[in-house]
Regions:
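Active-site segments that bind and position negatively charged phosphate/pyrophosphate groups
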Residues: 206-333
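A glycine/threonine-rich phosphate-anchoring loop and its flanking beta-alpha core
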Residues: 11, 114-212, 309
Length: 388
């Protein structure tokens, strides 16, 4: 049965082709100086930068630019952003980009007025903020992370070979998020499919736990089927508005905490993927796709009934006359076919990982509870070897 829970989400969402105009409604609520956060500069090529800047100026904002946010934003970049914000007495953080920009903005929001080293406080000791928090807004140009409607912020420390996420509370979540599916049309295919798999895996991580018949899992199955269907259209026609809008909307619901209500969750694929990312700096979604199937095939016997349900309800495997294990394996085989159809990375070797790295990656993998099997170090290492 569903466990006891409460649910709220403070982020206001604006969705659709005209959603950027909603900045006119939101910007007057916040202070004068805005730190504009973006990535490698693609928003300057596709015109989004000019649109955002015009709206900021129209609303009388002083804009301080903070570009160059990399995938898997680093602690060094975070410290650089803190310095920019402090020197300019920033009142508001506006992230224009994908999940890395949104994550960075949230990490920045709790670091600017923090007297301690944010890496140590939030990512090593996992403490909550006790300082002033700068409000954040997001204009999404790449989908996958769901960062626009949650409190998660992942930061990478290359010196320590660690990539760690901290899920902050409501006060850190974006005050608003603007989602225009057309802003995702110009993404390179690799980024698009990596984002699609990130969405799918977010749902899986919350789905593969518990055996109860609950509404949260039915919602997850519907979201997974929507992602599978729309992804097949999007890889053939990246400018299909209906497909891209459904993918964008599914990404938000996959990680705004809705589908985890009343149940435990299993985030081990993300823990493995983040540890891989700390060593390879590979695209996040591709680190997940490289380790997913070896992980799920390893834990399948411990959660056999849910894997059977996944096969039947999501992949439409016919269970008639088949043993449960066969049905479950067919479901994962269907998933593998779809992943290859998208062109996802299917092993760690493709990401540049070597056998010599595996012990370090295993040591950097945080062990999570909540799934069907709490792994030990040797099991983590075995799964990584099977992923190579």
């Amino acid at each position: 049965m569903l466990g006891n829970f409460s649910y709220s989400n403070p982020t206001k969402l604006y969705f659709g082709e005209e959603s950027l105009c909603s900045l006119n409604e939101e910007l007057p609520k916040y202070g004068k100086t805005v730190q504009l956060i973006y990535g490698g500069g693609s928003i300057k090529k596709n015109g989004i930068y000019n649109q955002v800047m015009r709206l900021l100026k129209d609303n009388g904002k002083v804009v301080v630019e903070d570009g160059g946010v990399m995938p898997n934003p680093t602690v060094e970049k975070l410290r650089e952003g803190v310095q920019i914000a402090r020197e300019n007495h920033v009142d508001f953080l506006l992230a224009v980009g994908g999940g890395s920009c949104c994550d960075y903005a949230k990490a920045l929001s709790v670091s600017v007025h923090c007297d301690e080293d944010p890496w140590e406080k939030y990512y090593i000791r996992f403490e909550e903020p006790d300082c002033e928090i700068i409000p954040v807004g997001c204009v999404l140009t790449m989908v996958g992370t769901g960062s626009e409607m949650n409190g998660g912020a992942v930061i990478t420390n290359h010196d320590q070979k660690l990539k760690i996420g901290h899920v902050f509370g409501d006060a850190v979540m974006p005050k608003f998020a603007i989602l225009n599916p057309k802003f995702t049309f110009t993404l390179p295919k690799k980024q698009m499919v990596a984002g699609i798999y990130d969405i799918f895996n977010h749902i899986c991580e919350q789905y593969f736990s518990g055996e109860d018949d609950n509404t949260s899992d039915y919602i997850s199955e519907a979201l997974m089927k929507s992602v599978i269907h729309s992804s097949r259209i999007a890889i053939q026609n990246p400018e299909d508005y209906e497909a891209r809008s459904n993918i964008m909307w599914a990404a938000t619901w996959a990680l705004n905490t809705l589908v985890s209500r009343g149940k435990s969750t299993d985030w081990m694929v993300h823990m493995l993927g983040q540890a891989v990312g700390a060593y390879t700096d590979a695209t996040h979604g591709m680190t997940l796709s490289a380790v997913s199937l070896p992980y799920y095939r390893y834990i399948m016997p411990y959660g056999l009934s849910k894997f059977c349900r996944f096969a039947v309800n999501v992949w439409e495997v016919n269970p008639a006359g088949k043993a449960d294990e066969q049905v479950a394996r067919e479901g994962l085989s269907c998933m593998e076919v779809w992943m290859k159809e998208l062109g996802l990375t299917m092993n760690l070797h493709e990401l540049g990982a070597t056998e010599e790295m595996l012990h370090g990656i295993a040591n950097g993998t945080i062990i999570m509870e909540g799934g069907y099997k709490v792994l030990n170090h040797d099991e983590v290492l075995e799964i990584l070897k099977n992923s190579l």
